[in-house]
A protein has these predicted regions:
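Fe(II)/2-oxoglutarate oxygenase catalytic core
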Residues: 1-140, 148-172
Length: 172
């Protein structure tokens, strides 16, 4: 959260009504990307989250059979998107992370790490599974980037929500 508060270069958001009336490609959060150009700045703060993610990813591959379907060594991370969502805002549109015609066509898996607890609302909701994942500090959620994992970020109703999201790509 301190990383976000000290970040000067983040993208601003729209109001909830403006976003609902706009193109579905517009987001209603504030975010910045930690990538190869600036990761050294964030490395010490993000290192423990990435170590925890690596353990969760190995568990995910074992539990789902992804280890036999894919060579796990063929996965690599993309940029880390760190988001701040204000109360009653967020990206409420049902979507998948693997859309035709976008740069994300090679996305295989999505992962999110919740950076704070949200008492009311703020869940990641999966349409076809009737499942809502409540934000808890350090909780890691991993899912396939394509159908049927249609999902949305529900608005936090009490307090702000901080989340780190990234994508696992398959090396060509």
């Amino acid at each position: 959260i301190k990383l976000f508060e000290n970040q000067d270069n983040f993208n601003n958001t729209m109001s909830r009504l403006s976003a609902e009336r706009s193109s579905i490609l517009h987001k209603q959060d504030q975010h910045f990307f930690a990538n190869k150009n600036n990761i050294k700045i964030w490395h010490s703060e993000l290192k423990s989250m990435i170590v925890n993610f690596d353990m969760a990813f190995k568990h995910y591959c074992e539990a789902t059979g992804a280890r036999t379907a894919f060579d796990v060594d063929n996965f690599h991370y993309t940029s880390l998107k760190i988001q701040k969502t204000l109360p009653t805002e967020g990206y409420h549109v049902w979507h998948i992370e693997h859309g035709k015609g976008y740069e994300n066509e090679a996305r295989a898996l999505v992962f999110s790490i919740y950076l704070n607890d949200v008492e009311d609302g703020g869940e990641t909701e999966f349409l076809h599974f009737s499942k809502r994942v409540k934000p808890k500090t350090g909780r890691i959620v991993i899912w396939p980037a394509s159908f049927p994992y249609v999902h949305r970020g529900n608005p936090p109703l009490s307090g702000e929500k901080y989340i780190l999201t990234s994508w696992m790509m398959l090396k060509p």
